[in-house]
Amino acid sequence: MISPQRRAEVIEALRRGTVPKAGLDALAVGYGRLQGTLDEELEAVAAGRGAFKAIRGEYGSGKTFFGRWLQERARARGLATSEVQISETETPLHRLETVYRRLVERIATADSGEGAFRGIVDGWFYALERDVLEDTNLDPTDEATLLAKTEALMEARLASVTKVAPAFSATLRAYRRALQANDNATADGLQPI
């Protein structure tokens, strides 16, 4: 059963002639033969393998609907998704830095809509601290030691990233330092996009 709020959101989007952002499972028909294969691919992604899908078709053929339906299924499995529509003026395919920026700006998770990248990075920093506390007999109130051990773990985990994307690693380090110093202006300016 669809809640009244969800029903109103879907109907309002359809009135505007747009694809609803959520609740597409209630409208999806004809995807039965694709569903098993796509679910297998989502499970493979959840297990650590990557996947990329591009959808191409004529105007009105259901590309956006299908993409958003698949994104809903992915987010329900705890995956992050991003949707970018390639266009000659807004996001041209030959401008990869623009495509990348749009992908990162529009990352969404089940817990937060578009713009979830900062939360993902902050969650990674939290996971580092949690891992340090679980692996050692560290006193959680010893902030200096916690910070030092977390920095060491971060460097170990960023080692392979630094080889292929040194600017990204440097931005993560600077962003974390700004957060630790409560320098929100610098942290906001360094969001690793």
Region roles according to the model:
Residues 61, 65-193:
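P-loop NTPase nucleotide-binding core
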Residues 58:
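P-loop (Walker A) phosphate-binding loop of NTP-binding proteins
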Residues 1-51:
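A short, basic N-terminal segment
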Residues 55:
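Hydrophobic anchor at the beta1->P-loop junction of P-loop NTPases
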